[in-house]
Structures are given as C-alpha cells and as structure tokens.
C-alpha cells in the first residue's frame, strides 16, 4: 500500500522530534542531520518542516493541553508516545485545516509503526479526550 506524502511527513517528523527530544540539540541541527541521513523521497517536505518547527515552537502549549488527559506524569511517558502525542497535539491545536479524525487516525497509525504494542491504544485514548476540549469534535 502506497503511503501518502503527508503520512511520510508525519512519520519523519516523529523520528526527527524524537531525536530532538533525546539529543537536546537545536531543531535546526536535528532537521539538517535528519534530511541529510534519511530517505526523504515521497515526503511532503513543506508539511514535514511545518510539523517539526510548529511542534517545537509550541511544545510548552502542547504539553499543557495534553497534560490533563495523561494518566501518568510527564517524565513517566514513553518518549515515543510523548513525541507522537506532541505532534498530534500540534495538528489538533494549530492545523485547523486537518480534520480532527484525520489527525487522530494518523497519530494512531504512526504509533503502530514506532510505538510499543499498545501505544496506539494509549495515543487514541488521549487524543479522543483532547479533541473535544479543543472544540475539534
């Protein structure tokens, strides 16, 4: 099955955001290294950059809107789940042209690829509660 350019952008953004979170390097350094080292064919590059930069620029706001819907402390969250939730939180809050069902479904699919066995269920549960709070349902 062919993966859409936006899905590829989301998958790559999650990988780059994870690298940023773990390495504590600047997002500019992470982006440069990522696009140099990874196969970016089939990626919606403008959307990749928008997701990457937008998530980092708004990370405190995103963390604040996610926090009430988490069942554990921030430092107890799996880093990949945290990264996927941040990206989806960015899309739900700031990318209003993306239907909320699409943002949630894409996050679930990305969690199936990169998360642990039940990550997609956790991501779905959190985002399903967040969307109405952002008036996206």
Curated annotation (Swiss-Prot):
It comes from the Bacteria. SUPFAM superfamilies: NusB-like. InterPro entries: NusB-like_sf, NusB_fam, NusB_RsmB_TIM44. Keywords: RNA-binding, Transcription, Transcription antitermination, Transcription regulation. GO terms for cellular component: cytosol. The keyword Transmembrane helix does not apply. The keyword Transferase does not apply. Disulfide bonds: none annotated. GO terms for biological process: DNA-templated transcription termination; transcription antitermination. One of its GO terms (molecular function) is RNA binding. Belongs to the NusB family. Involved in transcription antitermination. Required for transcription of ribosomal RNA (rRNA) genes. Binds specifically to the boxA antiterminator sequence of the ribosomal RNA (rrn) operons. PANTHER family: ANTITERMINATION NUSB DOMAIN-CONTAINING PROTEIN, N UTILIZATION SUBSTANCE PROTEIN B-RELATED. HAMAP family: NusB (MF_00073). This is Transcription antitermination protein NusB. The gene is nusB.
